[in-house]
Structures are given as structure tokens and as C-alpha cells.
Design a protein with these regions (language model features):
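Short aromatic-glycine-(Arg/Gly/Cys) micro-motifs in beta-strand/loop hairpins
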Residues: 1-13
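A short, exposed loop/beta-hairpin motif centered on an aromatic-Gly-Thr core
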Residues: 14-22
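Short, mixed-charge low-complexity intrinsically disordered segments
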Residues: 37-67
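Short Lys/Arg-rich basic patches
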Residues: 68-95
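Short amphipathic alpha-helical segments
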Residues: 94-96, 104-123
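Short, positively charged interaction helices/loops
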Residues: 125-158
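Short, charge-rich amphipathic alpha-helical segments embedded
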Residues: 172-195
Length: 203
């Protein structure tokens, strides 16, 4: 995936974490390892998608390429009417049925305002569920790459999606420390949504 220099990420050399933070800083530390012949993987902290970095050339070359990643077109501003605020909106195409467009157009402020309100309402209503889902997906994606062949992976995956925190921690305990810690960090929202079972039956 393409990412900007300020994307937060984590780099692994084998099972060892060698850098974490903004992509610009992480890329430089990863380049030092790559220049010595190491194989390095960089993961987006939000999604665990692998970030591809071109390490050729000098450190300045690497940072310059990160400043304008492929697939990130520059945003150009069109003229605004007098007094119209700069909202930082992005134009993209969406497809709806005619009746949907009719309803949106009839709303106060028009289709764009109505869509933004609907999105914000949905985000507020589903914020907790979305965080759990995103946490599950990010943790699973990372675990599949870094621990897919390790003992307990399948069981740990089931515990992750079931929200069984203690079971998850128990199953990943034999994994390398850095892999274990990062998986637990990614899974935090998914697992912390469920109450801890340990000790609940004690009087």
C-alpha cells in the first residue's frame, strides 16, 4: 500500500521489532537494516497492511519518494464563492438509485450536506462496533503474516474474534516477544470490549 511519511507504522526484521513511529523515521531505520542485507517488513499500525518502501539510493532519496507516494494524486482547489468556507472536502463518485438522489436533493442543504450528516450519525452510532471490527482485522492480518505457522495460531484467531482476552493471551504466550506484544496491542480494542473472565467466580 502507498502511505505518507506521517503514517504510523512498525517495522520488523524477522520476529524482532526494529522501529516504530512515523513512516519517515521508521523507513530510515529499516533502510539501515536492509542495506546490511536484512529482510524487513513494515506494517501500518492502523490496518496492519504491508507498506512497500523503495530503499534504493540515499536516505534523502527514500524520504523524497515517501513525500509523494504513488496513487496519492495532488488535491487541487477549485474557485470558491464569496464567503464560502474552506471545508477540506474531497470529491469522489458514488452511485445511488434515483429515489435516493431524489431524497438527498430534497434535504436542507442538498445532497452533500445530507450525506455528511448521515455519515456522521452512522459513525457515532456504530463507533464501538467499528473499532472492534477494525481491531480484529488489523490483528488478524498481522498475525497471519508473522505467526501464521506458529503453534496456537488458529486457536488464537478464534479467541480474537470471540473476544476472549485471557484465552488469547494464553495462546500467544509462546510466540516471540515482539510479535506477541504487537499482536496484543492491535487486538486491544477487540479484546477489551469483553469483560475479563478471570476471577469473576471468586467470592
Amino acid at each position: 500500500m502507498a502511505a505518507g511519511r506521517q503514517t504510523h507504522c512498525t517495522a520488523f526484521k524477522g520476529a524482532r521489532c526494529i522501529a516504530a513511529g512515523e513512516l519517515g523515521d521508521v523507513a530510515l531505520k529499516a533502510k539501515a537494516a536492509v542495506d546490511k542485507g536484512a529482510q524487513v517488513m513494515i506494517f501500518d499500525d492502523a490496518t496492519s497492511e504491508s507498506i512497500e518502501v523503495d530503499f534504493r539510493g540515499s536516505a534523502e532519496d527514500v524520504l523524497q519518494r515517501l513525500a509523494q507516494p504513488d496513487g496519492n494524486p495532488a488535491v487541487t482547489e477549485g474557485p470558491r464563492g464569496p464567503g464560502r468556507p474552506k471545508l477540506g472536502v474531497v470529491a469522489r463518485e458514488i452511485t445511488l438509485l434515483p429515489r435516493h438522489w431524489d431524497w438527498l436533493s430534497a434535504q436542507p442543504g442538498g445532497a452533500s450536506v445530507a450525506l455528511r450528516k448521515l455519515v456522521e450519525e452512522a459513525r457515532r452510532a456504530n463507533g464501538g462496533k467499528d473499532r472492534v471490527r477494525q481491531s480484529q482485522e488489523a490483528a488478524y492480518r498481522f498475525m497471519s503474516v508473522m505467526a501464521g505457522n506458529r503453534p496456537g495460531f488458529e486457536e488464537a484467531t478464534r479467541a480474537l474474534f470471540a473476544g476472549h482476552r485471557d484465552r488469547f493471551d494464553q495462546l500467544i504466550a509462546p510466540w516471540p516477544k515482539d510479535v506477541r506484544h504487537h499482536a496484543r496491542k492491535l487486538a486491544a480494542d477487540a479484546l477489551d470490549a469483553q469483560p475479563r473472565a478471570t476471577g469473576l467466580l471468586k467470592s
